[in-house]
Curated annotation (Swiss-Prot):
Family: Belongs to the PAL/histidase family.
Domain of life: Bacteria
UniProt pathway annotation: Amino-acid degradation; L-histidine degradation into L-glutamate; N-formimidoyl-L-glutamate from L-histidine: step 1/3
Protein source organism: Caulobacter vibrioides (strain NA1000 / CB15N) (Caulobacter crescentus)
Chief place where the protein resides: cytoplasm
E.C. no: 4.3.1.3
InterPro entries: Aromatic_Lyase, Fumarase/histidase_N, HutH, L-Aspartase-like, Phe/His_NH3-lyase_AS
Top class in the EC scheme: lyase
Compartments (UniProt record): Cytoplasm
Keyword set includes Lyase: yes
Protein name: Histidine ammonia-lyase
Gene Ontology molecular functions: histidine ammonia-lyase activity
Keyword set, alphabetical order: Cytoplasm, Histidine metabolism, Lyase
């Protein structure tokens, strides 16, 4: 059975973003040994609480609007099985495997903090599934982000009792078969365990973290394509002077301006028009890159701070406090912080794509760029980059619609017992699609900017940007005459999505380092 190569050791409550990113990128994880006694004590506390004979939500009562219904001791195991099966009610395509593996790791770290009352064997089952590469098939739709991500996490929990389906090495297998192949026995859930597994914000948080990690790469790629576009248009680097940005004081803006200066350093193209250039100021899409991209960087970092906290939290209900043998009902399952963070990421992704599209539009317009119309040597006979710019506009428009805040919506559920919800799940889930659109826009900009710089030969750009141009030309030749454009765009998109564009220039400001 195929297992992830890298295996991390998670310290519950203190896992850095870099480790969550590594899991998203394919690493596996086990809990630190110090977690197991804490888990065992929490489970023992549940038994002591039950022995008191008092009604405790989710342990010996019904759920949601049915919380007032008392459940007898003989039915406690059935109660937990029933909540898992009845709540596994998601719809839609399966969520991406990297996102669900991240969700599993988040749940693992949450359960290990000793506030959920789950037995050691239950937590070990989840850990073994993660290590062995068993990924539950989790439909992507069905969570409103309070009471946690009930439907998605129920699909995960169902596989642990042998119900549902699991991805293993690219195959989609019945859960019982996949567990058997890995030498694992389906669980019989104990008191509170079903509720503990399915109550929490881990699905929303995993999707938001995935969006954050991809948005960071998008941001860095856009610094590179933006600098290359500035060179193609013979734009000025004066707007990136540090004195300007020091006065504005925003850290992201200051770092972005410094990165753009470094990317364009020692450019022959830039030196060629330092004198005798009649233009006084560049268009905003060039001149205001530090202000726009810096604001995006700052807001991504704010979102990262929120998500780093959420990733290390316990969002179960009720919470078990072994030192007092108490179970306290609260609302940590409400994913409003995640919803806000996802909305911030969506805004940043939208704006990164929006200003990039404006740079493409500037490059294809000879009145603005001074380059041949639509970046073709024979305009009229050839259409050049005319329609790629249209495609970029379409993608940016889609992202503008998707950027509408999810957190401002709420629909009451569970007979108005759960009367305000966060909508964090779909707010976070849209992020990967938005980044995919913006990636395609940057791929188009990469081609357009490289084409524009070609017209300035034999002048060369900076060493960093020449490395990017050489990388681009290794996959896509100069456009002398019209040809089938789609393969060129796909090749450029791959350079953006793979991080190759970033690797070509070296270190850039980031979010999660």
């Amino acid at each position: 059975m195929e297992r992830p190569v890298t295996e991390l050791v998670l310290n519950p409550g203190a896992v850095p973003l870099a480790e969550w990113k590594a899991i998203y990128r394919g690493a596996s994880a086990r809990l630190a040994e110090s977690a197991w006694p804490v888990i065992a004590e929490s489970a023992a506390a549940v038994q002591r609480i039950l022995a008191k004979g008092e009604p405790v939500y989710g342990i010996n009562t019904g759920f949601g609007k049915l919380a007032s219904v008392r459940i007898g001791d003989a039915d406690l195991e059935t109660l937990q099985r029933n909540i898992v099966l009845s709540h596994a009610a998601g719809v839609g395509e399966p969520s991406p495997v990297p996102v669900i593996r991240l969700m599993m790791a988040l749940k693992l770290a949450s359960l290990a903090q000793g506030a959920s009352g789950v037995r050691v064997e239950t937590v070990r089952m989840l850990e073994e599934m993660l290590v062995e590469g068993l990924t539950p098939v989790v439909p992507c739709q069905g969570s409103v982000g309070a009471s946690g991500d009930l439907a998605p996490l129920s699909h995960m929990a169902a596989t642990m009792i042998g119900v549902g389906e699991i991805f293993v090495g690219g195959q989609r297998l019945p859960a019982a078969q996949a567990l058997a192949q890995a030498g694992l026995e389906p669980l019989t859930l104990g008191p509170k365990e079903g509720l503990a597994l399915l109550n929490g914000t881990q699905f929303s948080t995993a999707n938001a973290l995935a969006g954050l990690f991809e948005a960071e790469r998008l941001f860095q790629s856009a610094l590179v394509t933006g600098a290359l576009s500035t060179e193609a248009a013979k734009g000025s680097d004066t707007p990136f002077d540090p004195r300007i940005h020091t006065l504005r004081r925003h850290v992201g803006q200051i770092e972005t301006a410094a990165a753009l200066r470094a990317l364009m350093s020692a450019s022959e193209i830039r030196a060629s028009h330092l004198k005798e250039d009649e233009r006084v100021q560049d268009p905003y899409c060039l001149r205001c890159q530090p202000q726009v991209m810096g604001a995006a960087l700052d807001i991504l970092r704010q979102a990262a701070t929120t998500l780093a906290t959420e990733a290390n939290c316990v969002s179960d209900n009720p919470l078990i406090f072994p030192e007092a043998d108490e179970a306290l009902s609260g609302g940590n399952f409400h994913a409003e912080p995640v919803a806000f963070a996802a909305d911030m990421i969506a805004l940043a992704v939208c704006e990164i794509g929006s200003i990039a599209e404006r740079r493409i539009a500037m490059l294809v317009d000879p009145a603005l760029s001074g380059l041949p119309a639509f970046l073709t040597p024979k305009p009229g006979l050839n259409s050049g980059f005319m329609i790629p710019q249209v495609t970029a506009a379409a993608l940016v428009s889609e992202n503008k619609q998707r950027a509408y805040p999810a957190s401002v919506d709420s629909i009451p559920t569970s007979a108005n017992q759960e009367d305000h919800v966060s909508m964090a799940a779909h707010g976070a889930r849209r992020l990967l699609a938005m980044v995919e659109n913006a990636d395609a826009v940057l791929g188009i900009e990469l081609l357009a900017a490289a084409q524009g710089c070609d017209f300035h030969a034999p002048l060369r750009s900076s060493a960093a940007l020449e490395a990017v141009r050489a990388l681009t030309r290794s996959k896509v030749p100069h456009l002398s005459d019209d040809r089938h454009f789609h393969p060129d765009m796909e090749a450029a998109n791959t350079l953006v999505r793979s991080g190759a564009v970033i690797a070509a220039v070296g270190a850039l400001p980031g979010v999660t380092a």
